[in-house]
A protein has these predicted regions:
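N-terminal secretory/targeting leader peptides
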Residues: 1-48, 56-57, 63-261
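Short beta-strand-centered segments that line the small-molecule binding cleft or hinge
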Residues: 51
Length: 261
């Protein structure tokens, strides 16, 4: 999966006549600060993330992306917080020890689940449900919308631990070269429509989430809270500045989020 996702961003960087819809963390290959922006367990709500994407801090990241040939049209097509979906109740990192949890092929997901205590097991989504049924993996992670939309609940994984370890979101990108060739009046229309779409997506998720949880519960799914502090402590090694990141970028993100709370 990972090469396919990265290929979309690479096409944009190469100047292809192409719009890419990908996890914004992949922009981190070109602007490392984006990896910090999508580190695990940063956000408590959709609104926190949306406000941060509208800040001067992220405006600077967007400008750096444009220097790399990436025009960002949207950053918050959110599809929900990702939680653990397993057969047994998970409350602490210790409960995950030895458990094989399916992840996407992204390194950030693999590193996150590994730090949380699981044996991260990358699998294509098409193989995931059969792998759960056959016991190849002990569970998976994803949002309630994924759970209901793909009928994960019909399998043996009936427990959802509300880890909220990653905020699932997509961004929309186009080559700066291609963008510059679009007349300004149409640029304004395109940008406005993507911005409206972002807002609509967030409001839709907020309005539907409670109903989705109730529907999952009607199918026998049980939800439980976790020791958030224990998981955050386990994930601290991932809050380390990597090569190319702006010095202090994690602290700047933490400070901005603290100011919202």
């Amino acid at each position: 999966q990972l090469p396919a996702y990265k290929e979309g961003v690479e096409q944009v960087v190469r100047g292809a006549n192409f719009i890419s819809v990908e996890d914004p963390s992949f922009i981190g290959d070109y602007v490392p600060d984006f990896k910090a922006l999508y580190a695990p367990m940063l956000y408590r709500s959709f609104d926190e993330y949306v406000k941060l994407t509208q800040s001067d801090l992220v405006a600077d990241m967007r400008a750096k992306a444009e220097e790399q040939g990436i025009k960002i049209l949207a950053l918050h097509y959110i599809y929900g917080f990702r939680n653990l979906i397993t057969q047994k109740v998970i409350k602490t990192p210790a409960d995950l020890k030895g458990m094989k949890i399916r992840t996407p092929g992204s390194k950030s997901y693999i590193d996150t689940l590994s730090a949380m205590g699981a044996v991260a097991t990358p699998l294509p989504w098409g193989e995931t449900l059969s792998a759960v049924q056959q016991g190849v993996v002990d569970g998976l992670e994803g949002s309630e919308f994924t759970n209901i939309g793909t009928k994960v609940y019909e399998g043996p994984t009936k427990n959802v631990a509300n880890t909220r370890h990653i905020l699932g979101t997509c961004g929309v990108y186009i080559s700066t070269k291609v963008w510059s060739e679009i007349p300004e009046k149409y640029q304004a229309i395109i940008q406005d429509e993507f911005s409206k779409g972002e807002h609509h997506m967030v409001e839709l998720l907020k309005s539907q989430h409670g109903g989705v949880v109730k529907e999952l519960e009607s199918h026998g799914v049980k939800f439980n809270e976790v020791d958030g502090e224990a998981f955050r402590d386990a994930l601290k090694p991932l809050y380390v500045e990597q090569e190319g990141m702006t010095p202090g970028v994690f602290q700047a993100i933490f400070t901005a989020l603290d100011a919202m709370r």
